[in-house]
């Protein structure tokens, strides 16, 4: 008797691109009472269902992700980050992939900027 091959983990859901910008704010902008952040680190990674799929693949699981992706830069960044570890089953996306950008200074959140937000086609 042989053991059955492990089945892949199938993740279905919305993906977004998470961006984290970290730096230091030691001065205010001359044109507004807002901090100026000198960027030390700028990271991007899949978020939402993409993060769940990526973390499972890092643990050695075979993972299939079913999600909507488009032709925009954020979608391509997510594709590049997920392959080769995650097999993608892509649905069409009308519009652009959501991007959530968090800006921190000295380890403290200053602002989150949301962009994009297409709908599955």
Question: What are the residue ranges of the model-derived segments?
Answer:
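Conserved N-terminal subdomain of the carbohydrate kinase-like
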Residues: 8-9, 17-121
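A short acidic-Thr-Gly-centered motif at the start of a beta-strand
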Residues: 1-5
């Amino acid at each position: 008797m042989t053991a059955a091959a492990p089945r892949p983990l199938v993740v279905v859901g919305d993906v977004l691109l998470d961006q984290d910008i970290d730096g230091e704010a030691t001065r205010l902008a001359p044109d507004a009472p807002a901090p100026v952040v000198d960027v030390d680190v700028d990271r991007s990674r899949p978020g939402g269902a993409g993060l769940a799929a990526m973390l499972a693949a890092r643990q050695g699981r075979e993972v299939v992700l079913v999600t909507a992706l488009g032709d925009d830069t954020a979608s391509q960044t997510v594709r590049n980050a997920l392959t080769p570890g995650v097999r993608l089953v892509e649905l069409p996306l009308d519009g652009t992939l959501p991007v959530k950008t968090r800006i921190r200074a000295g380890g403290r959140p200053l602002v989150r900027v949301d962009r994009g937000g297409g709908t599955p086609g």
